[in-house]
């Protein structure tokens, strides 16, 4: 069994950053800010609610950072510093599990050039809480309330794969990363660099964590607007269609855990979006447009009503 000090040592940074003056091991981190603005977000991952027991320590470590990176990306900022809280059951408190978890955290931090600067650990049911700080670096901050009438609505990637991936794991009781949908759940992609470019024209933006329909409704409510959505334009993978057949659009609307970007743009920017799509090798689909109606209208949709199908942690 590792002591708290042993665990903390596993997370000490391997590459120093000049703006971090006081690091892990002190009572708090000291960071020199070059700009006045700071983006802050927090996500909590709990075993059985946010991830199944089949995930490895490495994958849990990676995913705990990635879902926070997606929140910072949704505002167009650059991720910089992480604070992590870890509750750990005694049976997992061993050097093998902890080293694997720490390796996952460090791997994503290195890939996205951000830094774990502090945190806490205690015994309890497995959960990971991450606070991520980001720097706008002088770019526009994209919030959820800027959609305007006639603005186009876009989404990145394929929607619904992560839901299918989670069900694959729960059904088979194993993690098969050869499966496209399973990979989408285990290792989502934070669209950080693309989001930075989107700040040039995007008027509102949100990441898709709790289902596409739910996030569309949030943008509508925050902007006091509505949307018309063409269900035929929702980007759905062949793998999702194969698994759910005629229910694939419904699953895309309600599934959650995709961590793709949903955003609005003024009309007439299709060629600009096409260039970004090619540059970042990311599918970007126009799925609808904004209205003044304060309601969501779905075209070409044949599935169940969606209002009561959106994800809510506290809904039974």
How would you describe each model-predicted region?
Residues 64-75, 109-110:
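A short, N-terminal amphipathic alpha-helix
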Residues 151-157, 187-212:
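Internal active-site segments that recognize and position negatively charged phosphoryl groups
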Residues 1-13, 90-115, 123-126, 133, ...:
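Glycine-/charge-enriched secondary-structure boundary and capping motifs
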Residues 30, 68, 76, 116, ...:
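Residue-level signal for inorganic ion chemistry
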Residues 35-38, 45, 78-167, 289:
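Glycine-rich anion-binding loops of enzyme active sites
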Residues 20-22, 53-69, 91-103:
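Glycine-rich anion/phosphate-binding loops
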Residues 168-189:
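A short, charged helix-loop
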């Amino acid at each position: 069994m590792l002591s708290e000090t042993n665990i903390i040592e596993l997370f000490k940074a391997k590459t120093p950053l000049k703006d971090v003056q006081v690091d892990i091991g002190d009572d708090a981190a000291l960071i020199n800010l070059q700009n006045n603005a700071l983006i802050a977000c927090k996500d909590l991952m709990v075993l059985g609610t946010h991830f199944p027991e089949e995930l490895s320590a490495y994958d849990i470590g990676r995913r705990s950072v990635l879902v926070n990176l997606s929140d910072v990306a949704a505002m167009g900022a650059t991720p910089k510093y992480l604070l992590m809280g870890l509750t750990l059951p005694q049976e997992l408190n061993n050097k093998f599990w902890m080293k694997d978890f720490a390796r996952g955290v460090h791997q994503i931090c290195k890939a996205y050039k951000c830094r774990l600067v502090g945190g806490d650990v205690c015994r309890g049911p497995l959960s990971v809480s991450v606070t991520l700080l980001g720097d706008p670096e002088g770019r526009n901050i994209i919030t959820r309330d800027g959609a305007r009438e006639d603005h186009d609505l876009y989404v990145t990637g394929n929607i619904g794969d992560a839901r299918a991936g989670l069900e694959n794991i729960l059904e088979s009781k194993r993690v098969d990363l050869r499966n496209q949908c399973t990979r989408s759940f285990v290792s989502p992609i934070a669209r950080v660099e693309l989001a930075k470019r989107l700040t040039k024209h995007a008027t509102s933006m949100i990441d898709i964590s709790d289902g596409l329909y739910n996030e569309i409704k949030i943008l509508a409510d925050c902007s006091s607007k509505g949307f018309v959505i063409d269900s035929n334009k929702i980007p759905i993978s062949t793998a999702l269609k194969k698994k759910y057949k005629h229910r694939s659009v419904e699953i895309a609307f309600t599934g959650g855990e995709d961590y793709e970007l949903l955003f609005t743009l003024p009309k007439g920017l299709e060629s600009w979006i096409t260039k970004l799509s090619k540059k970042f090798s990311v599918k970007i689909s126009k799925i609808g447009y904004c209205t003044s109606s304060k309601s969501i209208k779905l075209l070409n949709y044949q599935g169940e009503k969606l209002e009561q199908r959106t994800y809510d942690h506290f809904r039974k």
